[in-house]
């Protein structure tokens, strides 16, 4: 029969690739086995493994003593049992009944089975319908488990759904079914091609792909944990109307951090702004507190309340007192100072303060007072420390207005640009370079000679006397004198413009192209070619570039140089070129054309013949 070919292969020796081949072969034999399709109910019911537990006690009567659950006597055999059991209750003793059934496995009960085979097939058909509608294995959970532990032969009856009897010659289809599906009873129902399709992907290496996916997703999980674990003092920039503070379970009241995932500082009332873990949780190892991670400082602007301490055990710094009262924090607040806020309430809105980050008044330069001793309050800008440019500009403006409104008693000319002191009194100062100096302070930067009433040179707001200034100047490479005016630099050297000339024509090369020979002498281009250019072997003139050209064109023949217009035949004077009939045909060191060369050869040949 072709029924076993429909079942999925369970033996490990058979490769999975043969399953489709079997399916194709089964389809080819499907037409002649249509009559066998009526026998499909036994095929579906066979994996129920009902006969297996019944066969185990009969196979090994003196073995390990497999326990057979005491089922009630079958209803069909109730007529035959009273003669044996008498008035015993439905569950008879297991050992006696097992031996009795074992004593006649092929006797009367087997004959009744064979005689009522048709009736059993009908009952199996009805049972198959019931199995398709509901779970077919509920009536025999203990029998299936008992049958899975033993290893009975492959002979299992198709009709043993209720009776505890095993035939010796069961149908071939039932035998193969029980062999193919001994343990996975829940998957034995769908016998058609569909189970084969479902069993195909099972042997595939699915775990390898999942392992790769889990490996790749692990770094993502770590990143998520880190991003979800801000430091206890991290706070995003609060939006308008949003206030952050410390609640009853915040870090203001508990010195120990709650967990690796730190919640926002507080919740208000019953509103769920953020989840706060219970105080009993301990910090997870590996997710310690990073003091500088994600901390946001606004040291000079008014915003929400303060941040937490410098470590997990320090309390938070909160604003205390009236919200509109600004109070300088004297340094480090004691641990008990952070518990001023009542539990469950937000701290009062006020200027944000952070430890160590508030600017101190030391870096701010104290206001300079006039030398006359006048002093006064300059306003709040001199009291409140600030480093912003606009605040500094405002401070200087107020300072200037104060100096203008409160001049000193004596004649005040300003502050000295050299020493920074006030210049007070007539005859004590002078003005130079749009600045005010004391007479004793306005000196040469090199020799310290007083420059009042003397000519001086100002270089980058520095005063030089004339001798010192001249000594700082560069000297001309030609005349070796200091260059007081415009400097002309060439070949890495400094020149006076009138000293930078050609060594041959002696004209100034200021703004004119020039070149330098091997000895470092400066030449104009024309004189350089006249001096160093190759000379024509005909006219003996230097071969120079044409006017307006930068390249020199010359002809070299017989190791001699020629101008283009000088490259001619010595006899006829014809212009020679690279043409076929206009090439150079030298003879005895003479440059000749082809015609003249042939004529000279004939003459020489005739003369030689005459001499002979």
Swiss-Prot record:
Residue ranges with Pro residues bias: 183-193
Coiled-coil stretches: none
Annotated effect of mutating residue 612 to A: Abolishes binding to SCRIB
Keyword Acetylation: yes
Residue ranges of the region described as Disordered: 1-118, 132-219, 307-387
Site location (Breakpoint for translocation to form HMGA2-LPP and KMT2A/MLL1-LPP): 470-471
Keywords tagged on the record: Acetylation, Activator, Cell adhesion, Cell junction, Cell membrane, Chromosomal rearrangement, Cytoplasm, Isopeptide bond, LIM domain, Membrane, Metal-binding, Nucleus, Phosphoprotein, Repeat, Ubl conjugation, Zinc
Protein name as annotated: Lipoma-preferred partner
Gene: LPP
């Amino acid at each position: 029969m072709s029924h076993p070919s429909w079942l999925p292969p369970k033996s490990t020796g058979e490769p999975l690739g043969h399953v489709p081949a079997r399916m194709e072969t089964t389809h080819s034999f499907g037409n002649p086995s249509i009559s066998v399709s009526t026998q499909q109910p036994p095929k579906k019911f066979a994996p129920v493994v009902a006969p297996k537990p019944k066969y185990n006690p009969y196979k090994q009567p003196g073995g390990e003593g497999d326990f057979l659950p005491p089922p009630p006597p079958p209803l069909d055999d109730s007529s035959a049992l009273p003669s044996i059991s008498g008035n015993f209750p439905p569950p008879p003793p297991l050992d006696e009944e097992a031996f009795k059934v074992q004593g006649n496995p092929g006797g009367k009960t087997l004959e009744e089975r064979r005689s009522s085979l048709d009736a059993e097939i009908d009952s199996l058909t009805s049972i198959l319908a019931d199995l398709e509608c509901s779970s077919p294995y509920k009536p025999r959970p203990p029998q299936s488990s008992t049958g899975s532990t033993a290893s009975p032969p492959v002979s299992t009856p198709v009709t043993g759904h209720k009776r505890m009897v095993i035939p010796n010659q069961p149908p071939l289809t039932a035998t193969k079914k029980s062999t193919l599906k001994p343990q996975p009873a829940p998957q034995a129902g769908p016998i058609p091609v569909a189970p084969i399709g479902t069993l195909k992907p099972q042997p595939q290496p699915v775990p390898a792909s999942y392992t790769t996916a889990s490996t790749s997703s692990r770094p993502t999980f770590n990143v998520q944990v880190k991003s979800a674990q801000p430091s206890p003092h991290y706070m995003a920039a609060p939006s308008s109307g949003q206030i952050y503070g410390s609640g009853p379970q915040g870090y203001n009241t508990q010195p120990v951090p709650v967990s690796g995932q730190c919640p926002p500082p507080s919740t208000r009332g019953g509103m769920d702004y953020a989840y706060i873990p219970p105080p009993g949780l301990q910090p997870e190892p590996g997710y310690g507190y990073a003091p500088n991670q994600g901390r946001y400082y606004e040291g000079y602007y008014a915003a929400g309340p303060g941040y937490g301490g410098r470590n997990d055990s320090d309390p938070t710094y909160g604003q205390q007192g009236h919200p509109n009262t600004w109070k300088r924090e004297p340094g480090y607040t004691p641990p008990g100072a952070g518990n001023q806020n009542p539990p469950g309430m937000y701290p009062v809105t006020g200027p944000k303060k952070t430890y160590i980050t508030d600017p101190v008044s030391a870096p701010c330069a104290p206001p300079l007072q006039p030398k006359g001793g006048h002093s006064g309050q300059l306003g709040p800008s001199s009291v409140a420390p600030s480093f912003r440019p606009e605040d500094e500009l405002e401070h200087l403006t107020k300072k200037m207005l104060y100096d203008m409104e409160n001049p000193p008693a004596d004649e005040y000319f300003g502050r000295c640009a050299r020493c920074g002191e006030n210049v007070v009194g007539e005859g004590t100062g002078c003005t130079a370079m749009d600045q005010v100096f004391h007479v004793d302070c306005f000196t040469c930067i090199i020799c310290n000679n007083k420059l009042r009433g003397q000519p001086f040179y100002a270089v980058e707001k520095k005063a030089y006397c004339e001798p010192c200034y001249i000594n700082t100047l560069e000297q001309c490479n030609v005349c070796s004198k200091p260059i007081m005016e415009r400097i002309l630099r060439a070949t890495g050297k400094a020149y006076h413009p009138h000293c930078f000339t050609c060594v041959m024509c002696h004209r100034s090369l200021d703004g004119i192209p020039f070149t330098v020979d091997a000895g470092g002498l400066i030449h104009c281009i024309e004189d350089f070619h006249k001096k160093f250019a190759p000379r024509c072997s005909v006219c003996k003139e230097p071969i120079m570039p044409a006017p307006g050209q930068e390249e020199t064109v010359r002809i070299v023949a017989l190791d001699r140089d020629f101008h283009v217009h000088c490259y001619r035949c010595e006899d006829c004077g014809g212009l020679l070129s690279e043409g076929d009939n206009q090439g150079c045909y030298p003879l005895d060191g003479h440059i000749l054309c082809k015609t003249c060369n042939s004529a000279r050869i004939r003459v020489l040949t005739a003369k030689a013949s005459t001499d002979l």
